Curated annotation (Swiss-Prot):
This is Arginine biosynthesis bifunctional protein ArgJ. Substrate binds at T158, K184, T195, E285, N408, S413. Belongs to the ArgJ family. The active site is at T195. It is an enzyme of class 2 (transferase). The keyword Amino-acid biosynthesis applies. Pathway: Amino-acid biosynthesis; L-arginine biosynthesis; L-ornithine and N-acetyl-L-glutamate from L-glutamate and N(2)-acetyl-L-ornithine (cyclic): step 1/1; Amino-acid biosynthesis; L-arginine biosynthesis; N(2)-acetyl-L-ornithine from L-glutamate: step 1/4. NCBIfam families: ArgJ (TIGR00120), PRK05388.1 (NF003802). It is found in: Cytoplasm. It catalyses: N(2)-acetyl-L-ornithine + L-glutamate = N-acetyl-L-glutamate + L-ornithine; L-glutamate + acetyl-CoA = N-acetyl-L-glutamate + CoA + H(+). It comes from Rhodopseudomonas palustris (strain ATCC BAA-98 / CGA009).
Length: 413
């Protein structure tokens, strides 16, 4: 957690409403940090369904493996998250730590260990002493309440500079349902079917299979379209929980993601995911500029995504943006190396709506002063038009600054 808040942090922080069936509490367990909270317990009422998507890393953490296995049951009663230690690449002791954490949480709230979901973030390769949770989780279970969403988001931070929360309220049938979310990010972010640590909660009565389908579809153009440094974490976890409490107010029970009654809910659900994903991009380690990459005119959407990611992950492109340089030559380089169909002589590039390159060469109307003024702004849009088809996609990233190097050079110090 940095004491210096990113200049890209949202200016408006939403008031997070209560969600029936969800209680939260945080504490300082002394996992790594001093003088701050580092463990979160979320308790959910019986009947809560769960869905999740996780890292594709072949070196997944022990909590990720635990959650993947328990997700088969489709039900959840608790979520335990710790910051400061990722419990990744920790061998047999890592699995034992995950098991002990789940057992302690289950004892604290009175459920089965298989109904406890886990997430850890922090340093990789250091054993997690789960005995530090003994007693702490019991106290959290007693202290848990329906408020405290911002405190929860703060407890899961590592190098983040601000807590990330989002909320939406929508009608399901004739009843009002709420969707709350929190996330943490900052570095080692290039998600694939998941991201960092993100948790979504709703009181909508959704089956586990329905929730899973919504989550899997929702991450495609939100969390999976964000990259900070091109590195996919061992711990990426996105979990969604539905308590179903809104059924008491007349919300219909939904078992299929294709149910037309879900239309407004899906829109709101995806909006929460998109909001959190953008906050992650805004809080990239050392970031001073939010960068939106749009690729259009590609052969396919898949091709457009790959080209957009090639641009977004290029250190040369990102450092040019940090230097407020509209260096379209580096964008051309990134397009060319993406391995996707592209025609140099059809390529056009613009920065914040000002075209700098057209038909494979510098735009005849290029004005250095005009473009330089745009590059000083905190939000930069790079649009690439390939002129080959109708494929289009969008990716969010940030610039690459000296501070990113400093943060990661000192991370274990």
């Amino acid at each position: 957690m940095s004491s210096k808040v990113s200049p890209l942090a949202p200016t408006d922080v939403p008031a997070m409403p209560m969600i029936a069936g969800v209680r939260l509490a945080t504490a300082a367990a002394g996992i790594r940090y001093k003088g701050r909270t580092d463990v979160l317990l979320v308790e959910m009422e019986k009947g809560t369904t769960v869905a999740g998507v996780f890292t594709t890393s072949k070196c997944a953490s022990a909590p990720v493996e635990w959650c993947r296995d328990k997700l088969k049951g489709g039900s959840a009663r608790a979520l335990v998250v710790n910051s400061g230690n990722a419990n990744a690449f920790t061998g047999k002791s890592g699995k034992q730590a995950a098991t002990l954490t789940a057992q302690l949480a289950a004892k604290a709230i009175g459920c089965k260990p298989a109904e406890v979901f886990l997430a850890s973030t922090g340093v990789i390769g250091e054993p997690l002493d789960a005995t530090k949770f003994d007693g702490v989780l019991d106290a959290l279970a007693l202290d848990a309440g329906p408020d405290g969403w911002m405190d929860a988001a703060k407890a899961i931070m590592t190098t983040d500079t601000f807590p990330k929360v989002a909320t939406a309220t929508v009608k399901l049938g004739k009843a009002k349902v709420t969707i709350n979310g929190m996330a943490k990010g900052a570095g080692m972010i290039a998600p694939d079917m998941a991201t960092m640590l993100s948790f979504i909660f709703t009181d909508a009565p959704l089956s586990a299979s329905c929730l899973q389908a919504l989550l899997k579809a929702g991450v495609t153009d939100t969390f999976n379209a964000v990259t900070i440094d091109g590195d996919t974490s061992t711990s990426d976890t996105l979990l969604a929980f539905a308590t179903g409490a809104a059924a008491e107010n007349g919300a219909p029970k939904i078992s299929r993601a294709s149910d037309p009654r879900l239309k407004a809910f899906v829109k709101a659900f995806n909006a929460v995911l998109a909001d959190l994903a953008e906050q992650v991009a805004r809080d990239g380690e050392g970031a001073r500029k939010l960068v939106e990459i749009i690729v259009e005119g590609a052969k396919t959407k898949v091709s457009a995504r790959k080209i957009a990611l090639s641009i977004a992950n290029s250190p040369l492109v990102k450092t040019a943006i940090a230097g407020e340089d509209a260096n379209w030559g580096r964008v051309v380089m990134a397009v060319g190396k993406a391995g996707e169909p592209a025609d140099r002589d059809k390529l056009s590039i613009s920065f914040n709506g000002i075209r700098v390159a057209k038909a494979g060469a510098r735009d005849p109307s290029y004005n250095e002063k005009e473009v330089s003024a745009e590059m000083k702004k905190p939000v930069i849009q790079i649009k690439v038009a390939l002129g080959l088809g109708k494929g289009r996609d969008r990716v969010l990233t940030c610039d690459l600054t000296k501070e990113y190097v400093a943060i990661n050079g000192d991370y274990r110090s």
